[in-house]
């Protein structure tokens, strides 16, 4: 009898008896993301950990159990998630991005800042769209950053504004659209440009001196942080990583920030973001609204960048390719690669990558500034 009861207890403790239909739906979504990442190569560094975190939390929800529940110590991914909520991991991601980024194209062509700024139009489109859909001001602000296609900044702002219940859907939407940049952007770019404009070649960028590259992160940190102190965690870490790279005197720190530390943070960030997508938290109308708003915002941001690129093309009498305008969103370097790919489709000798990197890295700064602006407006520091 004791053996039968033991077996019965073991059977009823399996996940099969504790999961609901929604959990199986989310498991299917996680497997789909893994398929996209592994078989089709859609940003595997992002989607594999996110999808696996999604898989784990929907099979074993207690992996996200808060500290103190029933006297327990809390689930493993709960502690990972707190690093998101406290804005530690997004800031470290920015340091790694800075250590890997060459701001030379932006320094050589400062007009790229305008294209990066134009692409932020999608953020404010999403903000007013979210307000219209019934979200409160802070929730709308957190959702709107998806329009910049910037996962770390989306997580950072959602945590700072206290929108922790929306952090999962916001982060998954932001990272999903980052991964889908090669699919979403080209049709918009082609819709708003002529074949002649797509064939425009741009002149070689001027050489950028070592002194300029060293001064850039220092000056940007001082200027932006003085104007918007709330941007200091993101801009400061981004520029610190870049200063590691450009100074040339801390090679070990550059390698650590851009490789080992970056990948460790991506693993922890990805799995913890995925773990916020339990069926209960994710399968609701708010999630559908966030996904829709994110897509619309990203499309509007791409469109605004391309249209501003057309304006610059007209103003410079054909010296600027409108295709680099779409790179103003902060999905680095995916958006710049898309500009290169679309341009090469119409002229294989057209090399736009370095020109597109200017607005692309400007978009990273622009999205961080937009997040800092929202924080300042709502009095969050």
Predicted features along the sequence, with ranges:
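Interfacial helix-loop-helix linkers and transmembrane-helix boundary segments
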Residues: 38-47, 66, 77-80, 100-115, ...
């Amino acid at each position: 009898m004791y053996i039968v009861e033991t077996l019965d207890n073991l059977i009823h403790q399996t996940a099969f008896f504790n999961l609901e239909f929604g959990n199986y739906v989310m498991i299917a979504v996680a497997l789909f993301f893994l398929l996209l990442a592994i078989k089709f190569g859609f940003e595997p560094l992002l989607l594999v950990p996110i999808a696996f975190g999604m898989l784990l939390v929907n099979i074993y929800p207690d992996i996200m159990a808060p500290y103190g529940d029933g006297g327990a110590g809390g689930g493993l991914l709960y502690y990972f998630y707190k690093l998101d909520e406290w804005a530690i991991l997004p800031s470290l991601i920015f340091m790694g991005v800075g250590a890997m980024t060459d701001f030379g194209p932006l320094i050589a062509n400062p007009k790229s800042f305008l294209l990066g700024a134009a692409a932020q139009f999608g953020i404010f489109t999403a903000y007013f769209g979210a307000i219209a859909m019934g979200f409160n001001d802070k929730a709308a602000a957190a959702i709107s950053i998806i329009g910049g296609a910037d996962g770390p900044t989306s997580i950072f702002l959602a945590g700072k504004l206290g929108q922790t219940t929306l952090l999962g859907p916001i982060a998954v939407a932001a990272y999903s659209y980052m991964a889908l940049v090669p699919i979403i952007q080209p049709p918009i770019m082609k819709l708003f440009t002529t074949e002649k404009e797509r064939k425009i070649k741009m002149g070689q960028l001027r050489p950028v001196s070592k002194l300029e590259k060293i001064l850039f992160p220092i000056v940007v940190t001082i200027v932006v942080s003085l104007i918007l102190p709330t941007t200091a965690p993101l801009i400061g870490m981004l520029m610190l990583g870049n200063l590691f790279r450009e100074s040339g005197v801390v090679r070990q720190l550059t390698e650590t920030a851009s490789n080992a530390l970056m990948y460790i943070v991506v693993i922890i960030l990805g799995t913890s973001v995925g773990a916020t997508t339990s069926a209960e938290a994710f399968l609701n109308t708010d999630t559908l609204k966030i996904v829709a708003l994110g897509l619309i915002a990203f499309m509007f941001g791409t469109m605004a960048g391309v249209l501003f690129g057309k304006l610059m093309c007209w103003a410079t009498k054909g010296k600027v390719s409108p295709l680099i305008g779409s790179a103003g969103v902060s999905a680095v370097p995916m958006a710049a690669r898309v500009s290169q790919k679309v341009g090469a489709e119409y002229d294989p000798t057209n090399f736009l990558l370095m020109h597109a990197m200017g607005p692309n890295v400007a978009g990273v700064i622009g999205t961080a500034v937009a997040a800092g602006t929202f924080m300042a407006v709502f009095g969050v520091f």
